[in-house]
């Protein structure tokens, strides 16, 4: 159901509720939920929709789910990419054999190119 859009999921729940009633009067709680549009949520559901961030022993800061990308950018420091190899120079043959060949293997072109003869 996570793949369905919110509107489609709500419509599906409405259809299931109406099919379960089968002509009987709806209980008051079900009617209230249908009239609210499912906006009422329990404490656990409301807490699940937030990201809790603890910064340097401060009090937790709650961020809503819609702001997760902005919050992640604001809270995460810029990171330098880790170097793939730790070779000091190109004369270190052992490092070149074990490290740089892997880099070439990962970054190589996946499509074979035809050999052109002159």
Swiss-Prot record:
Entry's Gene Ontology BP terms: regulation of vasoconstriction; vasoconstriction
Subcellular location, record wording: Secreted
Effect of residue 106 to V: In RNA edited version, Sarafotoxin-i3
Pfam families listed in its UniProt record: Endothelin (PF00322)
Site positions for Endothelin-receptor binding site: 105
Propeptide: 24-84, 112-118
GO cellular component: extracellular region
Disulfide pattern: 85-99, 87-95
Keyword rRNA-binding among UniProt keywords: no
Posttranslational modification: Different length molecules ranging from 15 (85-99) to 30 amino acids (85-114) have been found in the venom.
Any one GO MF annotation of this record: toxin activity
Tissue: Expressed by the venom gland.
Signal peptide range: 1-23
Record keywords: Cardiotoxin, Cleavage on pair of basic residues, Disulfide bond, G-protein coupled receptor impairing toxin, Secreted, Signal, Toxin, Vasoactive, Vasoconstrictor
Function of the molecule: Vasoconstrictor activity. These toxins cause cardiac arrest probably as a result of coronary vasospasm. Sarafotoxin-i3: vasoconstrictor activity. Causes cardiac arrest probably as a result of coronary vasospasm. Displays low agonistic activities towards endothelin-2 receptor (EDNRB) (displays affinity in the micromolar range).
Family: Belongs to the endothelin/sarafotoxin family.
Protein name, entry field: Sarafotoxin-i1
Organism (species): Atractaspis irregularis (Variable burrowing asp)
């Amino acid at each position: 159901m996570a793949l369905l859009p919110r509107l489609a999921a709500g419509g599906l729940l409405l259809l299931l509720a109406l099919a379960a009633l089968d002509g009987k009067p709806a209980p008051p709680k079900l009617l209230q939920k249908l009239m609210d549009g499912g906006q009422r949520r329990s404490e656990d559901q409301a807490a699940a929709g937030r990201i809790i961030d603890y910064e340097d022993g401060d009090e937790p800061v709650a961020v809503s789910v819609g702001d997760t990308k902005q919050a992640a950018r604001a809270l995460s420091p810029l990171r330098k990419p880790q170097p793939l190899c730790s070779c000091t120079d190109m004369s270190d043959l052992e490092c070149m054999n074990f490290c740089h060949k892997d880099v070439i293997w990962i970054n190589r072109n996946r499509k074979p190119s035809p050999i052109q003869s002159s």
